[in-house]
Amino acid sequence: MHSFPPLLLLLFWGVVSHSFPATLETQEQDVDLVQKYLEKYYNLKNDGRQVEKRRNSGPVVEKLKQMQEFFGLKVTGKPDAETLKVMKQPRCGVPDVAQFVLTEGNPRWEQTHLTYRIENYTPDLPRADVDHAIEKAFQLWSNVTPLTFTKVSEGQADIMISFVRGDHRDNSPFDGPGGNLAHAFQPGPGIGGDAHFDEDERWTNNFREYNLHRVAAHELGHSLGLSHSTDIGALMYPSYTFSGDVQLAQDDIDGIQAIYGRSQNPVQPIGPQTPKACDSKLTFDAITTIRGEVMFFKDRFYMRTNPFYPEVELNFISVFWPQLPNGLEAAYEFADRDEVRFFKGNKYWAVQGQNVLHGYPKDIYSSFGFPRTVKHIDAALSEENTGKTYFFVANKYWRYDEYKRSMDPGYPKMIAHDFPGIGHKVDAVFMKDGFFYFFHGTRQYKFDPKTKRILTLQKANSWFNCRKN
């Protein structure tokens, strides 16, 4: 198999990407990354033909478009910064558009009772932790299907699990730390169903490095016949993220049940769904500014827009802050200290950039002086010019002085009295350019705190440049 000549690929790079303040060495590395990524995951046939240098055509461009469409990126056929960012993420080694084909059609196990064997163990974890991680991964799939799984200690099992490194004689060598973490084969005889984990990775049972339970649950989905999902919230999404609780999204459940049917449980499990930025029914749990940007939070996810990138960025909260819980209920930025404070229940966390500050979480009672009757905060914002922070709880609000570190006297007050027209409850709020933006359900109210008037009423997701709401 031949490679595209490096000079031609660099010419391709110069034509299809915008100017980067990067060294020639960096560009060469990125060109090599693009070629290898598309060959491995998008079946790019590297036959040595010249890449078109002046038109958006040719095999590399078409495969780039295919990859960008799969990951929900802006489809340009150009190796832009967002595309390279995705390519550099650790991920599963199974291709996105061509499975490890062993049999024609849609492979599945004919029997519902399957066996598995762990052939060897990683030294990164105690054996009991490895056993537990793999067992829990199988349970995720058995909970939603008629499938059952039994661990055996010797002989040939339906699904053989091993920790290997480099070239391990399956025509899909591992690449060292990072990059390709693991892979598994679709159901079938011999190597079919087997799962291999790269021993050059550091496997853990927490959010650090690579969580074995999380990766195993994904790979076993392949062992059962699933391919990759384009849903970023699905366990079968190809890139690795750890979002705290490892669970099947509804997309995963729908996929596996399409192959094996529903479980025999009287109550059918339901998985979380990934929010869609332009869903007219979209609501938010919390919103805050952070260093000039606005971040929107929903369940396990954050959403944000970037003036340099028109697409809405959607990802797990844990990508930025792995120590924060999912389902945040309120957030606000205190710019004077470059802090953002996140609330859930009666606890809150303070972060600077991507770092959760030492000593958190703390409780809202000793820190802010809330009465014990307050069980959680619905929404919060802080006025940068006054140091006053507003906390909205049910139909009332408190005002806190950040500099005196105490509640202002005379509070709580009624929301409806001091913020006429926005209703009795606030789901989320933030301040930008001197205006308060209140959110309740699918509605957003732009409020002028000086005149105490609502200026505009829009859909909650109006910040996302959706064509239709």
Curated annotation (Swiss-Prot):
Residue numbers binding Ca(2+) 3: 175-176, 178, 180, 198, 201
Entry EC number(s): 3.4.24.7
Main location (coarse class): secreted
Positions annotated to bind Ca(2+) 1: 124, 199
UniProt key word Protein transport: no
Glycosylation sites: 120
Active site: residue positions: 219
Domain of life the protein comes from: Eukaryota
Free-text description of this protein's post-translational modifications in UniProt: Undergoes autolytic cleavage to two major forms (22 kDa and 27 kDa). A minor form (25 kDa) is the glycosylated form of the 22 kDa form. The 27 kDa form has no activity while the 22/25 kDa form can act as activator for collagenase.
Entry's Gene Ontology cellular component terms: extracellular matrix; extracellular region
InterPro entries associated with the record: Hemopexin-like_dom, Hemopexin-like_dom_sf, Hemopexin-like_repeat, Hemopexin_CS, M10A_MMP, MetalloPept_cat_dom_sf, Pept_M10_metallopeptidase, Pept_M10A
Keyword annotations of the record: Autocatalytic cleavage, Calcium, Collagen degradation, Disulfide bond, Extracellular matrix, Glycoprotein, Host-virus interaction, Hydrolase, Metal-binding, Metalloprotease, Phosphoprotein, Protease, Repeat, Secreted, Signal, Zinc, Zymogen
Catalyzed reactions: Cleavage of the triple helix of collagen at about three-quarters of the length of the molecule from the N-terminus, at 775-Gly-|-Ile-776 in the alpha1(I) chain. Cleaves synthetic substrates and alpha-macroglobulins at bonds where P1' is a hydrophobic residue
Entry GO MF terms: endopeptidase activity; metalloendopeptidase activity; peptidase activity; serine-type endopeptidase activity; zinc ion binding
Paired cysteines (S-S): 278-466
Positions bearing the site annotation: Not glycosylated: 143
Family statement: Belongs to the peptidase M10A family.
Protein name: Interstitial collagenase
UniProt organism field: Homo sapiens (Human)
Gene: MMP1
